[in-house]
């Protein structure tokens, strides 16, 4: 069903059930001839653990089982004490992205370019503080507040690239229902403000900036319409590229300014490494 909706450019919003439904949503892209970027708002990475529930172990299946269409996994809001050091190291080893709760809560805008590059967004409601979600059956003293989680869903909605969206792992209570309804409302509001920029727009609508760093040339693009930024991931010769053409990676003005100071943006470096793994 998700596959058919995505083919028809209809965005499915999946509400309810456990978060391992993310795996089924991911598999819906198998026949769409594309690599998939998954963004999860979650307090843990959901790798398979001994005696773990399926809802807390779906990511291992996505990474291991074929066909392997996953290009990037990005986690927003993980809390260190819920994740082993081995899991954190594995995220780094695979050049995935992970942003701690405090990092995102302090500067919510750090999530915008992450969502702008997402195809599939999966939100675990247990990433929200219980005092805001109303979930006291599985008490979470820390997490995003109501304003922050709605800001994140709005970023997901406004992303031109997001084609499926899910909200999972909540208890069917009237308290949580109010928050989830508002999260979905903000996603839909964000969708109404989509600007149809990259990958749909023409490069003529962008200003191109070339920044030399050592033996590299970083190519940035800034949109005339929204003022948003992208950085080019080049197609490398003589290696196997997962991305079969030159691609633009969403970034920020701060990434451009850092490049001008000879600092290579971390998201660009990780994307380069993933592309040739």
Language model: regions and residue ranges:
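Conserved alpha-helical scaffold segments that buttress catalytic/binding sites
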Residues: 1-167, 171-277
